[in-house]
């Protein structure tokens, strides 16, 4: 199948041609672990998980390397640690914050149905030169200084943006427009106001590593340059993240990596997902519409109920990844209704058997058009109506195997229901026993006993549906009352 991706750098949709089809390489910026991930953070996690699945489908499971980092050294982490654990030494407090937050992040993304990336490096593991020879931050900074792209000033090491003629190409911001940019700190010791920190000195209490420039810690941008190079090399296929990372983070990553390695590019395709707002407004703690993934999963703060992770995932995928998304209760309720109906169709089948629907594959290959793919899944679900026998079975299997490409319908109906805190589960063996008794009662025309068993099941929260199977024989199916 053909895969075309929109490249932020060239501002066009291009055919995807990997550097090495036997090892397709993708890097996506991960969390800074100072606070639980909010629902906006979930979008790139889900979007690039779908791309990871698609690349594995095209090139093979063992031929895709997906790296998503964890930033565990940052001034925001220091501030949170000092606030939350004022009685502890800062380094110990930082360890508590980062471990708890990283653990919660992993639980959140698992609940969203995301596959684990191939590698999840932590920034603190790549500050100093490593025994395995993988790229590290100190060595990259040395290379930048040696090549004339960085300098020491005011106790810091800074990147000289004027040393890179096409700095700003990704974001479209010309250097002369950035001299008084709102997001750029202007310091007297900088050669140019847009120069950014590669290394900063640490106080006695702050996290720090011994380096040629004194005890200090890395700047944010150099971390991703080191970790991507460590696992993917100097140039790789895809770099992803949210629109908010284009400038300054991704712009500065490109500058550091290209100048340190002497390459003309860092990644061949730059992909960015759109912004998320909540009920028509920008998400903000001050507006009271700021929600973490964990809050949506485990509390009733949004919409008066707890939401299964798969519902959150589908709600994200119904909008194209480059379009803005309005996160609403109505959208989640609709997504839940859709999943409920799809799981009613696939039931407790455990395997995704057969070929992925051609149209679903084509939509995903067209710049990851999950919105169109979801619409096509609706059509597949509807196509089983009026069919019987093998045709009905084929439609059901096509729905499941195609939805799995999006990370949906990857479990049995019962397993799905178990993820919904609002659903009361019952003993399926007991239900099967009672259904057998009811069938026997109906066969001997003991309708009073049949109705009694039906009422007993209803009291357990079980709804019966009497009908016929694919061969036209009487059949009773059941589901949990919703």
Curated annotation (Swiss-Prot):
**Complexes and interactors:** Monomer.
Principal EC category: ligase
Q: Which organism is it from?
A: Nitrobacter hamburgensis (strain DSM 10229 / NCIMB 13809 / X14)
Biological process GO terms, please? Answer: cysteinyl-tRNA aminoacylation
Renumbered ranges of motif 'HIGH' region: 31-41
Catalytic activity reads: tRNA(Cys) + L-cysteine + ATP = L-cysteinyl-tRNA(Cys) + AMP + diphosphate
Q: Can you say where in the cell this protein is located?
A: Cytoplasm
**Record motif 'KMSKS' region, residues:** 282-286
Q: Name one GO molecular function term.
A: cysteine-tRNA ligase activity
Instruction: Name the family the entry cites.
Output: Belongs to the class-I aminoacyl-tRNA synthetase family.
Q: What EC designation does it have?
A: 6.1.1.16
As cofactor, the record names: Zn(2+)
Positions bound to Zn(2+): 29, 224, 249, 253
| Cofactor binding mode and count | Binds 1 zinc ion per subunit.
Q: What is its main location?
A: cytoplasm
**Could you give one GO CC term from the UniProt record?**
cytosol
UniProt keywords, alphabetically: Aminoacyl-tRNA synthetase, ATP-binding, Cytoplasm, Ligase, Metal-binding, Nucleotide-binding, Protein biosynthesis, Zinc
* Name of this chain's protein: Cysteine--tRNA ligase
Sites binding ATP sit at: 285
Q: Name one Pfam family in it.
A: tRNA-synt_1e
What InterPro entries does this protein map onto? Cys-tRNA-ligase, Cys-tRNA-synt_Ia_DALR, Cys-tRNA/MSH_ligase, CysS_C, Rossmann-like_a/b/a_fold, tRNA-synt_1_cat_dom, tRNAsynth_Ia_anticodon-bd
């Amino acid at each position: 199948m053909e895969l075309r991706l929109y490249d932020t750098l060239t501002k066009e949709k291009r055919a995807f041609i990997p550097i090495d089809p036997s090892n397709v390489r993708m890097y996506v910026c991960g969390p800074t672990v100072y606070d639980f991930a909010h629902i906006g953070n979930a979008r790139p996690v889900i979007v690039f998980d779908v791309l990871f699945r698609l690349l594995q489908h095209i090139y093979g499971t063992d031929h895709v390397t997906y790296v998503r980092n964890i930033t565990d050294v940052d001034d925001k982490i220091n501030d949170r640690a000092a606030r939350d654990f004022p009685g502890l030494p800062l380094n110990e407090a930082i360890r508590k914050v980062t471990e708890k937050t990283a653990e919660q992040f992993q639980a959140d993304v698992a609940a969203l149905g995301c596959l684990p990336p191939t590698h999840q490096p932590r920034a603190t593991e790549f500050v100093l030169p490593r025994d395995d020879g993988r790229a590290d931050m100190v060595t990259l900074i040395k290379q930048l200084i040696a090549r004339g792209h960085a300098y020491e000033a005011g106790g810091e090491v800074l990147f000289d943006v004027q040393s890179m003629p096409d700095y700003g190409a990704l974001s479209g911001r010309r250097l002369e427009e950035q001299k008084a940019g709102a997001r750029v700190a202007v310091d007297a010791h900088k050669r140019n106001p847009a120069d950014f920190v590669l290394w900063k000195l640490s106080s006695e209490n702050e996290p720090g590593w011994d380096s040629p420039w004194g005890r200090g810690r890395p700047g944010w941008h150099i971390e991703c340059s080191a970790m991507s190079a460590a696992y993917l090399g100097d140039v790789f296929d895809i770099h992803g993240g949210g629109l908010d990372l284009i400038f300054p983070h991704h712009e500065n990553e490109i500058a550091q990596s290209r100048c340190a390695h002497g390459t003309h590019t860092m990644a061949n395709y730059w992909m960015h997902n759109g912004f998320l707002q909540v009920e028509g407004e920008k998400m903000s703690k001050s507006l009271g519409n700021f929600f973490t993934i964990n809050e949506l999963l485990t509390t009733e703060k949004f919409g008066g109920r707890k939401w299964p992770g798969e519902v959150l995932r589908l709600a994200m995928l119904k909008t194209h990844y480059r379009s803005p998304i309005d996160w609403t209760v109505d959208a989640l309720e609709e997504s839940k209704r859709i999943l409920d109906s799809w799981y009613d169709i696939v039931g407790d089948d455990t395997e995704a058997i057969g070929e992925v629907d051609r149209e679903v594959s084509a939509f995903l290959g067209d710049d990851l058009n999950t919105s169109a793919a979801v619409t096509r899944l609706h059509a597949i679900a509807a196509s089983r109506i009026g069919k019987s026998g093998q045709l009905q079975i084929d439609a059901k299997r096509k729905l499941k195997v195609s939805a799995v490409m999006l990370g949906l319908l990857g479990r049995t109906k019962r397993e799905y229901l178990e993820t919904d805190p609002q659903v009361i589960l019952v003993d399926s063996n007991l239900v099967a026993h009672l259904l057998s008794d009811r069938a026997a009662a109906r066969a001997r025309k003991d309708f009073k006993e049949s109705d009694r068993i039906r009422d007993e099941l209803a009291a357990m929260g079980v709804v019966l549906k009497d009908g016929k199977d694919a061969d036209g024989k009487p059949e009773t199916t059941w589901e949990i009352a919703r």
